[in-house]
């Protein structure tokens, strides 16, 4: 089984020029809408140009592209293959990013919109969970990016 997992959507109705999707994530207890209005990187590189990542201690992400294209860079040293690049579009389903996975994303030139149907655990604190971590100041232990 791959370390990279998706929560697929279900098409439950189609009419001319309209598709109805069930995008339910049973595990979700929070939803975030993340809009990149152009070719954005989140989190952006730091002041010296080093990559930065988010690493949530108390949240699993279920990131689903609803418009555009977004590419995720993932590092998780507990996986058999700790480094992955995953390109998402509206057909991909929700990319599951487990807690403690280093991650960042890059949008295509036209930007992108992602809904994150997250699962937040006891101890979640938004002011702590969304602080970028710089590779210049923090080692990823196994690999250098």
Please describe what each predicted stretch is:
Residues 38-45, 91-94, 98-100:
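Tight coil/turn sites that cap or link beta-strands
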Residues 109-129:
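A short hydrophobic beta-strand segment most commonly corresponding to one strand
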Residues 134-138:
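Low-complexity intrinsically disordered segments
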Residues 56-76:
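Short, conserved beta-strand element in jelly-roll/cupin
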Residues 1-46, 50-53:
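A short, N-terminal "cap"/entry segment at the start of jelly-roll beta-barrel domains
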Residues 143-145:
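Conserved small/polar residues in nucleotide/adenosyl-binding loops
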Residues 72-73, 97, 103-109, 116:
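Short beta-strand His + acidic residue motifs that chelate non-heme Fe in jelly-roll/DSBH
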Residues 78-97:
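Short acidic-glycine-tyrosine-enriched beta hairpin
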């Amino acid at each position: 089984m791959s370390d990279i997992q998706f929560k697929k959507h279900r098409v439950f109705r189609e009419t001319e020029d309209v598709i109805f999707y069930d995008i339910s994530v049973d595990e979700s207890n929070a939803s975030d809408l993340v809009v990149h209005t152009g070719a954005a990187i989140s989190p952006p590189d730091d002041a010296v140009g080093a990559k930065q990542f988010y690493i949530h201690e108390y949240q699993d992400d279920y990131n689903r592209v609803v418009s555009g294209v977004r590419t995720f860079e993932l590092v998780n040293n507990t996986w058999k293959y700790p480094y992955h690049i995953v390109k998402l579009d509206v057909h991909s389903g929700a990319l599951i990013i487990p807690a403690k996975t280093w991650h960042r994303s890059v949008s295509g030139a036209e930007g992108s919109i992602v809904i994150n149907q997250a699962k937040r655990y006891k101890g979640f604190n938004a002011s702590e969970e969304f602080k970028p971590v710089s590779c210049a100041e923090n080692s990823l232990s196994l690999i250098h990016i």
